[in-house]
């Protein structure tokens, strides 16, 4: 399974690690992904998703159904 948020599509970021002597090396900054079982009230069932912690905060604020609808994702297919 790839390291991609199933709701937002967030992926790893290519960055640079800079040492004290300013030597720059490539570094991959991974998304903070969590495997969660979330209750989908409209579908009256649990949905297992791999989401970022940022998406989890938004789900707590808006609700899973409303957030998925705003992103154009059909939870019935998941």
UniProtKB/Swiss-Prot annotation:
It comes from the Bacteria. One of its GO terms (biological process) is translation. One of its GO terms (molecular function) is structural constituent of ribosome. This is Large ribosomal subunit protein bL28. GO terms for cellular component: ribonucleoprotein complex; ribosome. Pfam families: Ribosomal_L28 (PF00830). The keyword Ribonucleoprotein applies. Keywords: Ribonucleoprotein, Ribosomal protein. Belongs to the bacterial ribosomal protein bL28 family.
